[in-house]
């Protein structure tokens, strides 16, 4: 970032990033059924959020999931896409697997790369090549330098529509199962000093 006043701004489906607007993302952690995602999309639109989020290929902390989920993953992507169209709200969904890049890029408005894959460089590179807007979450143990370095992999492929997302940090020494991540408020202004990319938080 050569000029401290310079901030990249771009629009996704008419929603501007990098300006005064604070884009709001809302929706379920995982797309479980067609009816549920339609009902939630309707509420998201009514409440004024800008994007519908939902994981079709959702990674979970534990491997236990129903057989129904495994059968409906690809359908889930289509369900959230159709719900977004029905209520005229753009969508964002997470990608986990390079083999799904083309499929997910076809349906989503923003590709989300979760904290688990922040430094999965082959995945970053393949997603970047779609030229779709990409939200890059900071891994809970990653430094600011690591985070910005991961973003550079996307920018290097000519994709300038990168949104940084502060995910929070893990506090392992507490070993509390009731708490997951603590928002690192310090990293947001620190990142703004070093990068022109827009930043959101989860």
Where are the model-predicted features located?
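Alpha-helix-loop-beta-strand connector modules within alpha/beta enzyme cores
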Residues: 67-93, 126-133, 185-199
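Short, well-ordered coil/turn segments that N-cap beta-strands
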Residues: 20-22, 48-50, 85-91, 107-109, ...
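Catalytic beta/alpha-barrel core
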Residues: 53, 69-72, 88-97, 109-122, ...
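Catalytic alpha/beta core domains of metabolic enzymes, predominantly
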Residues: 12, 17, 130-201
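Active-site mouth loops of central-metabolism enzymes
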Residues: 21-39, 62-70, 90-94, 114-115, ...
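Glycine-rich, proline-tolerant flexible connector loops at the mouths of alpha/beta enzymes
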Residues: 53-75
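Conserved, mostly hydrophobic/aromatic
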Residues: 27, 44, 52, 104, ...
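N-terminal amphipathic alpha-helix/helix-capping segment at the start of soluble metabolic enzymes
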Residues: 1-25
């Amino acid at each position: 970032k050569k000029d401290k006043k310079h901030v990249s701004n771009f629009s996704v489906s008419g929603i501007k990033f990098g300006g005064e607007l604070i884009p709001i993302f809302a929706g379920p952690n995982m797309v479980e059924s067609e009816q549920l995602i339609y009902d939630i999309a309707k509420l998201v639109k009514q409440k004024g959020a800008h994007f519908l989020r939902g994981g079709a290929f959702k990674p979970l902390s534990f491997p236990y999931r129903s057989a129904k989920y495994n059968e409906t993953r690809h359908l889930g992507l289509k369900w959230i896409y159709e719900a977004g169209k029905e209520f005229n709200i753009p969508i964002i969904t997470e990608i986990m697997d390079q083999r799904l890049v083309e499929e997910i890029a076809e349906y989503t408005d923003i590709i989300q790369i979760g904290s688990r894959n922040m430094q999965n460089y082959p995945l970053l590179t393949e997603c970047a090549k779609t030229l779709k807007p990409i939200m890059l979450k900071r891994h809970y143990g990653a430094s600011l330098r690591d985070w910005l370095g991961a973003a550079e992999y996307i920018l290097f492929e000519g994709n300038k529509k990168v949104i940084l997302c502060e995910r929070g940090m893990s506090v392992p020494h507490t070993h509390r199962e009731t708490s997951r991540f603590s928002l690192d408020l310090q990293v947001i202004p620190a990142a703004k000093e070093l990068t022109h990319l827009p930043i959101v938080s989860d």
